């Protein structure tokens, strides 16, 4: 039912897909995007031991169960229940994110059910969700997850690829080179940028080590970037 409601709401919002917003609203939207992506990706992160050990159950990884897990994580982090009926850009982003999340976990049911080491890792999941999300929110909001070239497990997630054509690509690359863990939310020309560094969790360090990448827990692990056109 939620998926049907989300699809209907997105269709109704399509007429405003290219409307620009104020800087203040864009900053709020950037924060919301950070919350959505962090908590959504965390759902798959929580399941990594079960996925890697081929110990998931069909009920545990069904699309509905995973969406419910996302809603629970969101509520715990935000302090408020997830409301997909919210108005404005925040509501549009929530609906697009849930639709993208649901679409991806539905497409990859085989991986989630069969499992195995690295069968469905959080970074891959996040990349697929953002790809779908960006298509739904074209002209309104774009979201990216990327890292420094020397620390990429997958070259497809390099800045020059995921942010191709973005006015923020050069600035993001420069910020990442500093390795700073401080977020940056600012206006750059006609765009508000939400730049949010990601810290490496123990599971990430362990997984990356298997690919020959030596990293430190709590260190810089790439960045999530929100790009929002403004008036």
Residue ranges and their predicted role:
Residues 14-16:
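N-terminal signal peptide c-region/cleavage motif recognized by signal peptidases
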Residues 1-6:
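Bacterial N-terminal signal peptides that target proteins for export
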